[in-house]
């Protein structure tokens, strides 16, 4: 089977032709290499430089686009308006209507999409297929399958039909994907469809036949092989172990790191090979020339229970590469007290002469292995000048209890709100050694009266495990005060405490919704949804309150200054992120994510994007900053057909297909969150349909790879046209 990567990339460039008209960051063979982008070298799904001739937009067309942006931003499902624009003469209006229907995430939109299934425009029909998947329309399976299997279906349409089957996750759709992959012939036309079908079948949770996936693992095209490796890794089927072992020696590191990630200990032990057979493959991967492969080998080794693996992980705590060292620490911690032999080395790794990230990771692992052994290093790190060190110390000290009083007291006035909240939670919990609940409540009385939102948040959080119906008035009063705060942490913690009371005996939800018959804010709707589940919908309905300051003039400005210029072939806005590790340039995608692009540009213009810490760094996955502002309005996460490639710029919030968020509530599944900007270090197929492709890195992906926990965004500015 031979399909050239160039053919696959060219096909996907055509099907994603609505994206920003500039080239994406190259996928270098070795992560971190400063390799310039070459024609045809961009990762699949990346915006690709191309000239697209589009029909001009009339004044009335622009007005309709303005209307759609307003409906999306205000979460207003206006059926009549959507139906009218979905039947407009101009194909771009129909395409954008399909986008809006999907993003509004209202089941009524399925009927509008059904009426669009015969659209003559390929880009529109592809968007309809994509939107049908977003709305998880199980009644559309036969139609989507006809597109997938049809020999005359345009490539872009068939590709989106395959992608939709990765969101409508049923036994039937998995079988249809398997049949397609088993029967598809190799060639330039089928390559993009096969690529998407491999990712789609990998998103299915239930196991099934893997032969059709394995078939493409033998392709000469690396773009198909890594997708096959990813699908086999995600499948979790022990039967795939031999195939993953073979792929772990593939010439491409893109293939190898996904394959190595799939060789987990439990999975190997359930296979005919056994962990004794897979462990040598991991040890070989530790010597790989590519740090991504090494990192995944360390991560996977953490799932093995043998003494030899523990010894190897312990040695790797001293690795110079922080991806390797911190991943080793996490692996040791995941084994719990079975890692006691590593205690001395973990303690040593917390000492001040080590890099801060490994100190924090080692302390967290030490607490997981033997909590008492973490007391002394945590107390010392509580006085550290590094926020990363103090954050880790606060989290561990809060778990320790009475013996941690000294360390907790040193953090009660910390300059960081999150550290203070964690420390106060642990400190107030010291009173819980008393069996009498009245004594515990007295200990929190002063905290609830504090002017510091972190202290009040901690007061609620610290009593969540034992509070009962008699505490409901106190928590409701605390919530009323929290509504006046600029930060949201006290609102969230009081609702969580009330939700815990509700779970233990009931009464809290009724009292809360009686006092607040209307959701006080967009954020509170989300907190209550996660806490009280269906009772939130019963009380407040399915419509989250919308908090936006955008006026009609703003929507007009966004369309005229961001959408129309790029639609007409102009350059997209580019931003330069100056970080503590170097410079990263990104290009935005205002054609499909105009609201998000405008919001980021507004934050940049007013100087908000300065000295913003990277609070979450997962080696070979993501680099994510904390919120740029407190009490931000929830942003519309503009999910689009742009793929989540390596170097993708998104934010750490998501609309979420409903099955992704089972349990206690609709909060996460209904909308978005604050703009926690995130760089994707790897492609993230499992998140397709849940996160926006806001932009992508065009320069500095090696800098992204070097960012560590605690690094900062120093500043962000807009690049001038032509600026290098």
Segments predicted by a language model, with ranges:
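Structural detector for internal amphipathic alpha-helices that build alpha-solenoid repeat scaffolds
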Residues: 53-76, 92-106, 111-115, 125-137, ...
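Cyclophilin-like peptidyl-prolyl cis-trans isomerases
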Residues: 452, 473-724
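N-terminal secretory signal peptides that target proteins for export/translocation
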Residues: 1-4
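Short inter-helical turns and helix N-cap capping residues of alpha-solenoid HEAT/ARM repeat scaffolds
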Residues: 89-90, 120-121, 152-154, 189-190, ...
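Buried hydrophobic core positions in alpha-solenoid tandem helical repeats
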Residues: 80-83, 112-114, 143-147, 176-181, ...
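Compositionally biased, proline/threonine/alanine/serine-rich low-complexity intrinsically disordered stretches
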Residues: 26-55, 723-724
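Stable alpha-helical elements in mature extracytoplasmic
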Residues: 78, 109, 140, 173, ...
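Bacterial N-terminal signal peptides
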Residues: 10-19
């Amino acid at each position: 089977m031979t399909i050239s990567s160039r053919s696959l990339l060219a096909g996907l460039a055509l099907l994603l032709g609505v994206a920003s008209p500039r080239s994406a960051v190259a996928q270098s063979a070795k992560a971190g290499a400063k390799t310039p982008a070459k024609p045809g070298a961009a990762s699949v799904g990346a915006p690709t430089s191309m000239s697209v001739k589009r029909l001009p937009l009339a004044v009335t067309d622009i007005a309709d686009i303005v209307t759609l942006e307003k409906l999306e931003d205000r979460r207003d499902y206006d059926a009549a308006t959507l139906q009218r624009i979905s039947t407009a003469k101009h194909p771009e209006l129909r395409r954008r209507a399909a986008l809006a229907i999907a993003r509004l995430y209202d089941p009524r939109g399925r009927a509008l999409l059904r009426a669009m299934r015969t659209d003559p425009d390929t880009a529109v029909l592809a968007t309809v297929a994509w939107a049908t998947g977003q709305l998880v329309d199980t009644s559309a399976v036969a139609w989507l399958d006809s597109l997938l299997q049809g020999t005359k279906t345009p490539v872009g349409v068939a590709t989106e039909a395959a992608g939709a089957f990765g969101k409508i996750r049923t036994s039937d759709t998995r079988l249809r994907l398997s049949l397609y992959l088993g029967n598809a012939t190799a060639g330039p036309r089928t390559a993009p469809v096969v690529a998407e079908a491999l990712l789609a079948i990998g998103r299915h949770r239930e196991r099934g036949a893997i032969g059709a996936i394995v078939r493409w693992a033998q392709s000469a095209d690396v773009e198909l092989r890594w997708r096959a490796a990813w699908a086999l890794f995600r499948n979790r089927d022990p039967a795939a172990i031999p195939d993953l072992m073979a792929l772990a020696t593939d010439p491409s590191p893109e293939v190898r790191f996904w394959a190595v990630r799939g060789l987990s200990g439990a999975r190997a032990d359930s296979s005919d090979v056994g962990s004794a057979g897979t462990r040598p493959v991991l040890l070989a991967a530790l010597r790989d020339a590519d740090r991504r492969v090494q990192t995944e080998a360390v991560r996977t080794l953490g799932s093995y229970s043998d003494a030899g693996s523990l010894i190897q992980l312990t040695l790797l705590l001293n690795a110079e590469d922080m991806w390797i060292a911190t991943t080793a620490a996490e692996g040791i911690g995941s084994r719990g007290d079975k890692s006691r032999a590593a205690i001395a080395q973990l303690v040593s790794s917390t000492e001040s002469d080590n890099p801060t990230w490994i100190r924090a990771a080692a302390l967290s692992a030490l607490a997981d292995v033997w909590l008492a052994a973490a007391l002394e290093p945590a107390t010392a790190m509580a006085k550290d000048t590094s926020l990363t060190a103090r954050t880790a110390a606060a989290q561990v000290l809060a778990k320790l209890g009475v013996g941690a009083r000294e360390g907790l007291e040193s953090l009660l006035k910390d300059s960081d709100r999150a550290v203070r909240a964690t420390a106060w939670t642990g400190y107030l919990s010291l009173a819980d050694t008393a069996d009498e609940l009245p004594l515990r409540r007295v200990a929190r009385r002063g905290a609830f009266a504090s002017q510091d939102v972190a202290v009040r948040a901690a007061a609620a959080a610290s009593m969540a495990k034992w509070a009962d119906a008699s505490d409901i008035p106190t928590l409701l009063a605390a919530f009323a005060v929290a509504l006046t705060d600029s930060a949201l942490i006290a609102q969230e913690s009081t609702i969580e405490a009330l939700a815990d009371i509700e779970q233990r005996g009931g009464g809290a939800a009724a009292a809360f919704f009686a006092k607040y018959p209307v959701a006080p804010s967009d954020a509170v709707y989300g907190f209550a949804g996660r806490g009280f589940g269906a009772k939130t919908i019963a009380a407040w309905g399915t419509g989250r309150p919308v908090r936006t300051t955008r006026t009609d003039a703003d929507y007009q400005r966004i369309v005229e200054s961001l959408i129309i210029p790029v639609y007409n072939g102009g350059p997209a806005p580019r931003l330069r992120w100056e970080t503590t590790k170097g410079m990263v340039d990104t290009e935005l995608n205002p054609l499909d994510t105009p609201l998000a692009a405008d919001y980021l540009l507004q934050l940049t213009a007013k100087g908000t994007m300065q000295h913003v810490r990277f609070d979450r760094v997962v080696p070979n996955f993501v680099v994510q900053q904390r919120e740029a502002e407190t009490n931000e309005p929830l942003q519309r996460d503009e999910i689009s057909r742009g793929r989540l490639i390596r170097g993708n710029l998104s934010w750490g919030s998501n609309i979420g297909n409903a099955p992704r968020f089972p349990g206690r509530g609709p909060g996460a599944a209904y909308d978005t969150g604050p703009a926690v900007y995130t760089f994707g270090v790897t492609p993230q197929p499992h998140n397709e349909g849940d996160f926006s492709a806001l932009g992508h890195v065009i320069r500095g992906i090696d800098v992204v790879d070097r960012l560590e926990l605690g690094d900062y965004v120093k500043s962000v500015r807009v690049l001038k046209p032509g600026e290098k």
